């Protein structure tokens, strides 16, 4: 299970059986969960006094233990109904940010166990991402992963089944979305919600002005902050690249810190092997080009960046006895 801030992905027998937004909706009158995943996401920021929508994870870790437990249980129940599974107890591998504290790790473990996990193992996200893109993490060779998720960006140098150097920062997809919301308010004087800002990021999100296949401008409707009248704005990729520049700079600084701390022999391996970009943030237009120019290394986007971590977690589940970097 890739228990992400933005999405939760579950893999069983090498197949993705669930890929849903990490959102749960509750009835305030009864306290019962009424929707999970996509259905709950559709209610997000659109509820009334009787309905409360929650994103249980923030910055890659559980922010609401009870909601997280309900969400995990609901998602397992969802795939059990779809596929006719009987799941009284499960062996699970769950990924967590490399910078997680003991308290945060315990919260993930407890939520997973309460949701039906009999045997729960943990794996750090960059290790799972490396496995998911086909890297032999047990080899005596240095590889570098930059995983830009919803809540955290994970940067790691991996060799001999361990993380040699790493950085885990909370500048990631959510912060980029907030940057766009702020930009629309400050430059265009319109208010947009999180879902609209996400759409802007998908349609015209970029971090480099000189890109191939530039996307068409994206039309956004919002409430004019001056008079609340509806207003239409055409947003282009260049202005989004400008508004995201500061946050991408923070990610670049974290990459630099990791490279500076990397032993010389492993650095030489990274020069030869390049750096793999995974996570939803890897899809920002021009990111690989910008980072390659900044560091003089070959940054390349993973073949399946959205699912690399989940795929690696599924492989780890099948190799529990061979991967001693898994832990409980």
Please give the residue ranges for each predicted region.
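Nucleotide/phosphate-binding catalytic cleft detector across ATP-hydrolyzing
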Residues: 1-148, 156-276, 282-328
């Amino acid at each position: 299970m890739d228990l992400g801030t933005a999405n939760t992905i579950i893999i069983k027998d090498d197949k993705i059986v669930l890929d849903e937004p990490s959102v749960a909706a509750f009835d305030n009158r009864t306290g019962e969960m009424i929707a999970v995943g996509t259905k709950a996401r559709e209610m997000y920021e659109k509820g009334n006094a009787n309905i409360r929508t929650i994103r249980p994870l923030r910055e890659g870790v559980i922010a609401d233990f009870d909601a997280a437990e309900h969400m995990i249980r609901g998602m397992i129940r969802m795939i059990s109904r779809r596929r006719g599974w009987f799941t009284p107890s499960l062996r699970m591998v769950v990924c967590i940010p490399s910078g997680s504290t003991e308290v945060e790790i315990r919260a993930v473990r407890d939520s997973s166990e309460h949701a039906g996990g009999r045997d729960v193992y943990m794996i750090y996200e960059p290790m799972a991402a490396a496995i998911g893109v086909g890297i032999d993490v047990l080899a005596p060779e240095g590889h570098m992963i930059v995983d830009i998720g919803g809540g955290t960006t994970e940067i790691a140098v991996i060799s001999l089944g361990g993380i040699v150097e790493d950085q885990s920062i909370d500048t990631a997809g959510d912060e980029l979305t907030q940057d766009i919301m702020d930009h629309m308010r400050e430059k265009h004087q319109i208010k947009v919600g999180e879902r609209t800002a996400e759409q802007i990021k998908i349609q015209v999100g970029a971090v480099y002005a000189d890109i191939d296949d530039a996307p068409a401008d994206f039309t956004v409707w919002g409430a004019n902050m001056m008079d609340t009248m509806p207003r239409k704005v055409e947003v282009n990729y260049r202005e989004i690249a400008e508004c995201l520049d500061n946050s991408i700079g923070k990610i670049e600084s974290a990459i630099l810190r990791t490279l500076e701390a990397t032993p010389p022999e492993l650095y030489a391996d990274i020069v030869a092997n390049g750096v793999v970009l995974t996570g939803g943030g890897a899809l920002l237009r021009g990111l690989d080009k910008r980072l390659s120019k900044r560091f003089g290394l070959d940054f390349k986007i993973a073949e399946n960046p959205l699912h690399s971590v989940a795929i690696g977690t599924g492989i780890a589940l099948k190799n529990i006895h061979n991967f001693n970097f898994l832990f409980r």
